[in-house]
Design a protein with these regions (language model features):
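A structured beta-alpha segment of the ubiquitous adenosine-cofactor-binding alpha/beta core
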Residues: 44-45, 109-128
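Substrate-binding/gating loop at the entrance of the active-site cleft, primarily
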Residues: 11, 35-93
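N-terminal Rossmann-like NAD(P)+-binding subdomain of aldehyde/semialdehyde dehydrogenases
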Residues: 1-41
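ALDH superfamily catalytic-core signature
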Residues: 98-103, 126-128, 134-199
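Short acidic loop-to-helix transition motifs that present clustered carboxylates
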Residues: 40-41, 63-66, 113-118, 136
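Amphipathic alpha-helical segments in well-structured domains
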Residues: 88, 92-96, 119, 167, ...
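Generic beta-strand/beta-sheet core signal
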Residues: 58, 76, 81-85, 112-114, ...
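Catalytic binding pocket for nucleotide-activated donors in carbohydrate/polymer assembly enzymes
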Residues: 83, 87, 98-107
């Protein structure tokens, strides 16, 4: 229950703060320019042209909250082509259905529960993409600037020499960094590094 609630809270946070998210992503662009393709803002003539016809996503199974990453695409009028995680196809499917029920065009969504070959096709045919996976899955895309790779957790906790003797003050941070979301997120810490006592 706790993990489900936390993941859904992250998606809720992204949706309810979409105006702030879009402001950050667009640097305050008047979003009406997305519809017209051009306009004037801050005394400057602006034009908008998307860098991709669709955003490709190869989603993981470890956390429903990562679906919050593609939500701004819809507001930015960029279709999404999603390969859901094998064990967790439900969150992206439900989000897509909710967007369609709210009036978003069904054509803005592609939902393809497919294998690795299908995932590769999505990543290689969309102009921009995100891929989640282990090193064997993501390594082939590491040098492709059009594909944002989210691989296995390499996050570490570093306790400097100035703080190590007070390590008990940081137990809560260490615990949550390692175990939040059941320790399954790619941002979970996989080690605690203590240089003062390194061999």
């Amino acid at each position: 229950h706790v993990m489900v609630r936390r993941n859904m809270e992250k998606i809720h946070l992204a949706l309810t703060n979409m105006k702030t998210v879009l402001n950050g992503l667009s640097r305050g662009l008047d979003l009406a320019i997305l519809d017209s393709g051009s306009g004037e803002q801050f005394g400057t003539r602006l034009s908008y042209f998307p860098t991709t016809p669709a955003l490709g996503l190869v989603m993981p199974s470890n956390s429903p909250a990562v679906n919050s990453l593609w939500l701004p695409s819809i507001a930015l009028k960029t279709p999404v082509i999603i390969k859901p995680g094998k064990e967790e196809p439900w969150t992206p499917y439900r989000l897509i259905q909710a967007f369609i029920a709210a009036g978003a065009p069904a054509e803005a969504f592609g939902f393809y529960p497919t294998d690795h070959e299908g995932a590769g096709a999505i990543l290689n045919t969309c102009g921009r993409a995100l891929v989640f996976g282990d090193k064997s899955t993501t390594a082939q895309y590491a040098n492709n600037p059009a594909i944002q790779v989210h691989g296995p957790g390499w996050s570490k906790i570093l306790i400097g020499e100035d703080c190590i003797e007070h390590w008990r003050d940081y137990v809560d941070v260490m615990l949550s960094s390692i175990s939040d979301n059941g320790g399954r997120s790619c941002i979970n810490a996989s080690a605690i590094v203590v240089p003062k006592y390194a061999a």
